[in-house]
């Protein structure tokens, strides 16, 4: 993203940056976990990527809901349950917070949005149907 005159991040020119990536021969656009990106994904970033035929790979459920082609995501429900487990260890188990190990979830969901795959003419390889979660719907918020 670019900075404005006050040196704050701005969405201005974000679609142009996506086009520049495609012109520079990018094959995929990775969408990292970023709250500012999340606010722009559905209305700016993903439409710009679709316009130039650049597939998107999401890192969060929010970005998949915004319309990304595919992503390896942790379900927010699972993240909440895992967080509750950690809180329980600290508050009820009286474990000192600094001794609770840093861990990641052990299960992720590989998601593919079929409507986007069809538009980009990028059908998933058949073996992916054995483990991927296939999303047949449109993006959640319109």
Model-derived regions, located:
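Short hydrophobic alpha-helices and adjacent helix-cap/hinge residues
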Residues: 1-142
């Amino acid at each position: 993203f670019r900075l404005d005159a006050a040196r704050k991040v701005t969405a201005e020119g974000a679609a142009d940056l996506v086009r520049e990536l495609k012109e520079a021969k990018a094959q995929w656009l990775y969408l990292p976990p970023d709250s500012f990106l999340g606010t722009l994904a559905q209305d700016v970033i993903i439409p710009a990527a679709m316009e130039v035929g650049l597939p998107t790979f999401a890192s969060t459920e929010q970005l998949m809901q915004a319309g990304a082609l595919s992503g390896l995501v942790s379900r927010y429900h699972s993240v909440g349950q895992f967080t509750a487990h950690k809180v329980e260890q600290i508050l009820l188990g009286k474990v000192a917070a600094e001794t609770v190990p840093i861990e990641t979830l052990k299960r992720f969901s590989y998601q593919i949005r079929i409507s986007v795959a069809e538009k980009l003419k990028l059908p998933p390889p058949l073996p992916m149907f054995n483990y991927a979660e296939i999303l047949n719907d449109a993006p959640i918020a319109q």
